[in-house]
Amino acid sequence: MIRITDTAQEHFAKLLANQEEGTQIRVFVINPGTPTAECGVSYCPPDAVEATDTELKFEKLSAYIDELSKPYLDDAEIDFVTDQLGSQLTLKAPNAKMRKVDDNAPLMERVEYVLQSQINPQLAGHGGRVTLMEITDDSLAILQFGGGCNGCSMVDVTLKEGIEKELLQKFPELKGVRDLTEHQRGEHSYY
């Protein structure tokens, strides 16, 4: 379910030592399963534990997860990273915006999951996104770019060298990827 690294557990243990006795942490997702999903960690005093919560016991603490957030925190990882710029807590939850789909789910669902959980987070750095419009009878994934990708001069490279390569590697049943977008360069374009 959730992995909390040893360094993150040490960090939380230090913080929890200054809290009311019995206080643990709560890991949650606000707006789970949507493009605006956000993950968080908060203190969870004993009186805030709900009967429907799931308790995950770790060596130095327990983490509580509410029933609604639980499926969206599959494969999540909390780490405490130190580099030249300082230290920071990181929470990676690849399934927060979209629940992980089963390996034998329909191809459309599996491709959509990869786009939302792996491709779109990379495109978001440039204000872009991609949407799966359909999978044709001849096994072509038809995509539409939006945001900063629409009109971007690099969209063909992104499509062929990035997205298409990744999708064809993950889904051998696909024959190719096509772009449905009419690219008109504008103020929103990244390049």
UniProtKB/Swiss-Prot annotation:
GO molecular function list: 4 iron, 4 sulfur cluster binding; iron ion binding
Keyword 4Fe-4S applies: yes
Obligatory cofactor(s): [4Fe-4S] cluster
Keyword 4Fe-4S: yes
Cited function: Involved in iron-sulfur cluster biogenesis. Binds a 4Fe-4S cluster, can transfer this cluster to apoproteins, and thereby intervenes in the maturation of Fe/S proteins. Could also act as a scaffold/chaperone for damaged Fe/S proteins.
UniProt record similarity statement: Belongs to the NfuA family.
Protein's name in the database: Fe/S biogenesis protein NfuA
Organism: Serratia proteamaculans (strain 568)
